[in-house]
Amino acid sequence: MITGDSIDGMDFISSLPDEILHHILSSVPTKSAIRTSLLSKRWRYVWSETPSLSIDCRRADPNSIDKTLSFFSAPKITSFHLHTTLLNRIDSVNGCIEFAISHNAEKLSLESRDYRVRNYKFPDFFYTNSSVKQLFVDSGSVHLIPRCTVSWTSLKNLSLSNCTLSDESFLKILSGSPLLESLELLYCAEYMCLDLSQSQHLRRLEIDRSDWFMGPTKIVAPHLHCLRLRHSRLPCSLVDVSSLTEADLNIYFGDLKTVTAGFLQHNVVKMLQMLQNVEKLTIGGTFLQMLSLAALCGVPFPTLKVKTLTLETMIIRSVIPGITKLLRYTPGLRKLTIHTVKCSSISELHLNDYLRKHSLNQRQCWRSKDSVFPGSLETISMLASKHAESNLVALFMERLLKSTKSLETMVVLLVDYLDALGFEELLAMATTLSHNNDVSVLIKRSYIKYVSNTFPQR
């Protein structure tokens, strides 16, 4: 029940203009908004004029959804979100989509994780929409195979999750979205070559891949400014990202039995070479481990123009050779952030096995001054019990500070490494490190325990 201060016998909220009430109801699911119609005559039809609809019909009768939409009287929809199943509901789902399009929805979000239905294809009218500016599709059942010309002439943000689409289908989508600025492809399958050379307005690209959703293996994006590429067993070739200024990488290259020095040079380090104009770079733990192998194999690193570098890693010995060499080849670095998140890593056993097979002495590779740092299993154990020593973190910081000459600021975001006493000890050590290296050193606690899978909210 809505309560509030009374104004001449009328509650304060009910006295607000319709536009404000619509804004309030836009922030709740439509089912909850409809319930406000029972409050009073004033509220009876307010929900039906709200320009934002959020419908969850996974358990609802399709007829009740149709009835709800029939009461809707706003001339235009700013946002339409549909969370549904597809089994025995395809006609109803298509009807909802047609309703949103006919009301010129600017933001359209469709979510369905119903794996009982395979190969669902959107109707042709879905691909002809001049109003939508933001489109989000999350479904393990959707095959994006437009059988007609795509015309999304106002679309600026496109996010596809768990969808299947071919290279041919993707070209149709891109050619029909001339104003596209932001593209997210999260665990999408079958497309292999992502050619964005004709998408002149595209500035931001985010791709998450996995063992089951491999693509793409090639990216051509000369107009791109910001790239986030995460998690894959297959390497991804950056053919043209010449306008890139910001990148976030953590690529898992899979079975080390197939990894050679040539592979490292032509994939891991070559990816760095394509980032030579990037000024803001984030690198994850497994990518750092692969850089360590490249460094130990004597693979030359490119010189980078990075000014702000973020490392998302546990404090383990197997990332140190890669980090220190990377720092030496980043002469203009001004700010280094170390975020000690828990993340996936290649085991020490596999790394050492790789070194032996390539006639490299593991004791020499993990230098004596790096041997004080733990392996991945030891670090995970420390994270669980929070008994890492403050001097271990300080040694890690000192090791990195000695590898860079131009640094102005180091920020350490700690997750679960130290208890309260250890944290206070580290703060004191950081003051000494700051003075000795003429670098501003900041120590902060972080409550993000795992590497994020998405960009920060825009």
From Swiss-Prot:
Limits of the F-box domain: 10-56
Claim: Magnesium is one of the keywords in the record: no
Alphabetical list of InterPro entries matching this protein: F-box-like_dom_sf, F-box_AtFBL13-like, F-box_dom, F-box_plant, LRR_At1g61320_AtMIF1, LRR_dom_sf
Annotated transmembrane regions: none
LRR repeats: 57-84, 86-112, 133-161, 162-187, 226-251, 260-285, 325-353, 389-414
Keyword terms, alphabetized: Leucine-rich repeat, Repeat
Full protein name: F-box/LRR-repeat protein At5g02910
Native source organism of the sequence: Arabidopsis thaliana
